[in-house]
């Protein structure tokens, strides 16, 4: 995904997920290869070069998963993805709405009256987290601030928004921002 700027494996969620996956795979007598890809088409080419039992895909979009499924015969699992039509796709994901709801409820119970949620987009899983947060916190009392994905434009955006920091006591990051 473009937000990783070529540093996908430095993302804490992805690296910790790979660590857990590799432990499980190895405990079952298999091994794991890791291949970064900027475009989903690269996965098809890579998969055709090896005799693989299966593949785990992270970080692409719904249309990419659908295209992959139509071009690949080996089983594959989407890890924490957003699949609108999961036919023949196994999607291992968390309940993003409920996770957001729990965080929102927790902040409300702590007595906070306003919250600023920060994300680099307002679609898919991040949208679900924000919607859950609003439902748990208080509808209309949370604002979503969408920041640029790329590092330099993001820093410029932050500098331009510094005057707003006093408006909010808590900053709830919907996603891990890679700075």
Regions found by a protein language model. Give the residues of each.
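Short gly/ser/thr-rich secondary-structure transition/capping motifs
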Residues: 36-39, 59-60
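Bacterial carbohydrate/catabolite-sensing allosteric modules
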Residues: 2-3, 15-31, 41-45, 53-56, ...
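N-terminal helix-turn-helix/winged-helix DNA-binding helices
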Residues: 1-10
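A conserved, positively charged/aromatic
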Residues: 49
């Amino acid at each position: 995904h473009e937000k990783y700027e070529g540093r996908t494996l430095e993302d804490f969620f992805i690296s910790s997920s790979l660590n857990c996956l590799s432990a499980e795979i190895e405990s079952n007598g298999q091994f794991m290869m890791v291949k970064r890809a900027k475009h989903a088409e690269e996965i098809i080419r890579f998969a055709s070069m090896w005799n693989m039992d299966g593949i785990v895909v992270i970080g692409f979009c719904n249309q990419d998963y659908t295209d992959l499924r139509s071009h690949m015969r080996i089983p594959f699992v989407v890890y924490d993805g957003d699949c609108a039509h999961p036919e023949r796709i196994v999607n291992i994901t968390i309940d993003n709405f409920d996770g957001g709801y729990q965080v929102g409820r927790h902040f409300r119970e702590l007595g906070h009256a306003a919250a600023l949620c920060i994300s680099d987009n307002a679609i898919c899983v991040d949208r679900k987290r924000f919607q859950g947060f609003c439902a748990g916190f208080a509808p209309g009392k949370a604002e979503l601030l969408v920041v640029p994905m790329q590092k330099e434009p993001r820093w410029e955006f932050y500098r331009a928004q510094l005057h707003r920091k006093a408006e909010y006591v808590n900053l709830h990051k919907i996603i891990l921002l890679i700075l």
